[in-house]
């Protein structure tokens, strides 16, 4: 049958099972929005307050559901406003399809009104992108975009469509999408055998889990693997929830703000088994001193990650779930009682601690965990609150912790929380924000209110850019340049003006009461939590130092006294 390009866009989305699109209309994309209007019962459109909010919402939807997130934007500034969200998704391997519309084909390259080379701009931050200048190729291009976004290591794909292509007609035939196949043809049985041999030979193995394990859906296989290897397990920020954070074998996060147990344990192990990690600088610290006593065995779907940031001794390339299935089949149960005993001693010696009186970031995370029984979807912005959320909330399941890890995008959380809440209507979604981050995209409170989303926005408000100030305090001789936010902005009134409920709390009891009411609310709730401006994230590894040298505030005080 003959359809316009705009009709083809909508039909292709329906083919792919898309039920929600986040976006903002404009002149170039009007034909697509006009067609979307006719399919309101099949595809929900969420009008965000800003295109960046739409891209973050698509990201949060994708991370929390495992499905592709979709966002729309018009030409020019509409498209460029997506860029930060696309880059965020790219750095964290999130399957997002961004559909933009441009000026008509005859106007391309002529500096036309709202013309922008969005394909060129996003080339370094997309897994692939397309500009469609022939309507006969539109349907297959959109189908390819969805396949590329999900296959192997996921990532964002952009499809840019000139406006005249959305009006042009061509023949369209519906196609049933094929299931996305797991990457198994790259798994070499010889490599699997080598991995099994290394594990059997190890006396002090340690399992290090990243976001790849979440993406692959390998949690059950990972649990079996950890039990068979009889090894402690640490994770990255992106790996939260892949392995049960309440399990006795779990030792917490590794790296700059990792636990002392994980940092010391990895520094002492003789085999580090990396499952879906990219060995970022935030984890490695001084790369030359990282896991210096260990052989490193890496499992990853992306061959480009092998030996990229650190040299490994062996690797298995392919889908992590399938790799773990094959290794588990060939691996007998191992036993390392002395090693496990050493790790348990470290856990007892170096627990995460904080002052129990007063309102603080760690207290808020522990109380949120207690009140939600660990069953919420936690979203964060970027900064101190992000680290506290990673440290003190125990994640039992994958896709329950959403955060911008690779790019570190302030302003990510609220949009992502909207996407997560829409993708998971039966779950409680909570965005943890700093007062600096909240200012970035606080306009999306209006979106949450309009959509009647019962998400909770918890602002950890210290009236400073906390993480930047922490570095200024520790490494810049307390020169607090441009990090004080003492302008008296009333976040509660802002929330109420946008249709949400707002509370300001200054004590533990006030927070408990406000959070209890928030959990019972059917509309978004903002809780502005006033904490000490001088609170810091501990432990910490100084830049350029080995992760084994992580220190706390107490360590620093003792050093200064000596």
What are these regions (language model features)?
Residues 24-26, 45-56, 71-78, 133-134, ...:
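Active-site nucleophile and cofactor-binding loops and adjacent substrate-binding regions
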Residues 114, 450-543:
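Thiamine diphosphate
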Residues 136, 172, 197, 293-384, ...:
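Phosphate/pyrophosphate-binding active-site segments
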Residues 296, 368, 380, 419, ...:
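Hydrophobic, well-ordered secondary-structure elements that form the walls
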Residues 412, 416-454, 460:
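Catalytic phosphate/nucleotide-handling subdomain of diverse soluble enzymes
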